[in-house]
A protein has these predicted regions:
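N-terminal binding-site loop/beta-alpha segment at the start of enzyme catalytic domains
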Residues: 1-78
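Generic structural signal for well-ordered alpha-helices
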Residues: 3, 40, 63, 67, ...
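Conserved, mostly hydrophobic/aromatic
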Residues: 6, 18, 36, 51, ...
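Short, well-ordered coil/turn segments that N-cap beta-strands
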Residues: 11-16, 46-50, 73-77, 113-118, ...
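Active-site mouth loops of central-metabolism enzymes
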Residues: 22-34, 87-102, 123-128
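Short, acidic/polar
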Residues: 30-43, 96-113, 156-162
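Active-site gating/metal-coordination segments in enzymes
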Residues: 88-121, 175, 179
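Beta/alpha (TIM)-barrel catalytic core signal, keyed to glycine-rich beta->alpha loops juxtaposed to Asp/Glu
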Residues: 125, 129-219
Length: 219
């Protein structure tokens, strides 16, 4: 498996990563837990070292599955997870207040069976919390050893610049595929300028190659 360096803070990951959301959330019924664990471990055996989850997937269930699956190889893999929602409240509204980040990271660490998170993304930008406060909180968590690297997801160019000025951003995660190429206009050039890595989600168009669309499909 080829390796890639994300950003310039020393994070190296496999060229192919496994997004684990669909095992618990978003695309039909959840995969049976032991089958999901077996799939994740099969990916490890094939050289995948980069695994993506989030507290909102389930909510919480996906982190549990990923944590159990990767516990035997924790020191050999990179785990990315995300914060930014009130997952245990109706409506699951955005919440990136510093005190909330500090509270929810403890739950993620417990579910993932680890004492640190390799890459901690703000899942979505919270318009009610200045991103400088978010970045400052993550910088503190990095200093405490609970987080290794800071990431953003679906953030604008301005937001990326502001966050990066407070705490170096290692990676941005955004949708990118043959069917959605918006990041090419402004985001990818900015990431190259700032030496920030890019992690695409839904690179196969959210199931485009699974038979959902065929020659009989009309638009």
């Amino acid at each position: 498996m080829q390796q890639r360096q994300l950003g310039r803070q020393g994070l190296t990951v496999s060229a192919l990563g496994l997004g684990c959301m669909g095992l618990s959330y978003g695309y039909g019924p959840a995969t049976e837990k032991q089958q999901a664990i077996a799939l994740i471990r099969a990916a490890v055996e094939r050289g995948v070292t980069f695994f993506d989850t989030a507290e909102i997937y389930g909510p919480f269930i996906n982190e549990d599955v990923v944590g159990e699956a990767l516990a035997p190889v924790r020191d050999k893999v990179v785990i990315a997870t995300k914060f930014g929602f009130d997952c245990d409240k109706p409506g699951q509204m955005l919440n990136s207040r510093p005190e909330h980040i500090r509270a929810v990271i403890e739950g993620s660490l417990k579910r993932l069976k680890t004492d640190y998170i390799d890459l901690y993304y703000q899942h979505r930008v919270d318009p009610d919390v200045p991103v400088e406060e978010v970045a400052g909180t993550i910088a503190d968590l990095i200093a405490e050893g609970k987080v290794k690297h800071f990431g953003l997801s679906e953030a604008s160019a301005e937001t990326i610049r502001r966050a990066h000025a407070v705490c170096p951003v290692t990676a941005l995660q955004s949708e990118y595929s043959l069917w959605w190429r918006q990041p090419e206009q402004e985001i990818l050039p900015l990431l190259a300028e700032l030496n920030i890595g890019f992690v695409p989600f839904s690179p196969l168009g959210k199931g485009f190659l699974t038979g959902a669309i065929d020659s009989s499909t009309t638009f």
